[in-house]
Design a protein with these regions (language model features):
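C-terminal helix of von Willebrand factor
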Residues: 183-194
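Catalytic cores of nucleic-acid endonucleases
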Residues: 144-185
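Short, hinge-like loop/turn segments at secondary-structure boundaries
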Residues: 63, 134, 182-185
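Short catalytic-loop micro-motif centered on adjacent basic/acidic residues
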Residues: 117, 139-142
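Accessory nucleic acid-recognition modules appended to NTPase machines
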Residues: 1-132
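Active-site beta-strand-loop-beta-strand hairpin of nuclease catalytic cores
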Residues: 131-139
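Short, flexible loop segments at the rims of nucleotide/cofactor-binding pockets, characterized by
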Residues: 20, 142-144
Length: 194
């Protein structure tokens, strides 16, 4: 539980048992992790091998990200002070988007989605999330600012021949055909806007 902020703050957000205790293995913590999931305190977002529907058919059993039930709780676990929050963009620099990803995960779950994520076997591309949507898959890239670059997302869309990909950021709504930008504040409407 206490390792969650550090796990999410890493560039590669895949959950690593070795970060809990040197040499730790999944079996050492699987009961504790299951307890946290059973009580709805954390949510497991599995890694998938392909962005194809249904996503559950492509889940890796060992690769996953772990998200807290609530952005505020993650902030408290992280020792996030009101001064940092009120300082604006500095909070996103400090956590490299982890709070933003937490927020998006929370919104996707609230809308009844079951998010997953994809990363290439070579490690050169990753989608922050992917959801089943109207018989296909919507990959999502989360940006904590107005950065509109989406290299990994474009790679994923081309590789899996997806008709629609979503980037969410502080920028306004923008439909560029295959790629649509949904403002972070509106990500709860992904089913209607994508």
């Amino acid at each position: 539980w206490k390792s969650l902020p550090g796990q999410l703050a890493k560039e590669n957000k895949k959950f690593v048992y070795g970060a809990l205790r040197p040499g730790a293995r999944a079996r050492d913590f699987e009961e504790s992790l299951q307890w946290l999931m059973d009580y709805g305190i954390v949510h497991k977002v599995p890694r998938v091998s392909a962005l194809r529907a249904p996503l559950t058919s492509y889940e890796y059993l060992s690769g996953f990200k772990l998200f807290c039930i609530d952005t505020g709780i993650l902030g408290a676990l992280s020792g996030l002070t009101p001064a940092i929050v009120l300082n604006g963009p500095a909070v996103f620099t400090e956590f490299k988007g982890s709070l933003t990803e937490q927020y998006v995960a929370q919104e996707l779950l609230l809308q009844g989605n079951t998010p997953a994520y994809w990363s290439s076997s070579s490690g050169n591309a990753e989608t922050d999330f992917a959801v089943d949507h109207a018989g296909t898959v919507l990959p999502l890239e989360v940006k904590a600012a107005e950065n509109l670059k989406a290299k990994s997302l474009r790679i994923a869309c081309e590789k899996f021949k997806l008709e629609r990909c979503v980037r969410t950021s502080l920028a306004a709504y923008r439909d560029e055909g295959t790629l649509v930008n949904i403002p972070l504040w509106e990500i709860g409407q992904i089913d209607k806007l994508a």
